[in-house]
């Protein structure tokens, strides 16, 4: 499909993506454990909470959480994560951003996320033994959470998805799945789905059992897990938005507000934002490692990270992946990169 897209062979790309969806559904049909969907409407059902806790009609019926995994010290993930927390205040003001993290995330990033009122949960030793991409699914085991959305830390939330989420919440369906590219040929994209809590039980146990059986852990293991263990439960009561109708269950996206996010080149839900531009900065002093700073037009530090030096065409450089909103400021000389040598 990648080759078809690069060669602009749209019909072929769509054909093979639809075929892949069909084949993956056949694979998903082998799922043995399927959770039963409650008979009641999800909103009414969650007034008494599917975990068995009773709530008053006028009381706190649990939180709405946007769940992320975050690990490592790359601005490609950390800076987009911080932008998402800021964006959520206007796009999803009633939702709380939560990050499942480990100690590889810089303390400065953790502090900035907390300043923006994000929830930070450090995974424990047992949880840390499963791949980091799976951590965000732990929200499904949290009894305090009413409904959840699973998102990618390196993809910006948007008003397009807000419109889709609103339609889901009004649909009476327990789950929501989105596909927004011809390359989204998976049953559930790991960072593009959500649901009401209480249907799927013991998510951590399901993940551990799956990983014991499937030792071939790779960058899409989380999506394969969702296909093999979760899809059959989800599709019983799901609203699926699918821009290219790759699966027969898909429906078009509703109309949505156009903001600066939707105006980004090649925008689609789930787009890896920091892949659009790699900033290369030459280091003129001989060094192995530097701390670089991103400064705005007023000389204020936006962020700083440590980077190792690379050699390219006889020059010392650092390569930095930054959010589109940052890199565009650098492109037009409004913001700049400075650095100090560490090694």
Predicted feature residues:
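Short, acidic, metal-binding catalytic loop of nucleotide-sugar glycosyltransferases
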Residues: 83-95
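Catalytic core and acceptor-binding pocket of nucleotide-sugar-dependent glycosyltransferases
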Residues: 196-333, 337-338
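A conserved hydrophobic helix/loop-capping motif in glycosyltransferases and polysaccharide synthases
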Residues: 66-74
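Short beta-strand-to-loop acidic/aromatic patch adjacent to the donor-nucleotide binding site
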Residues: 145-154
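Short internal beta-strands
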Residues: 96-103
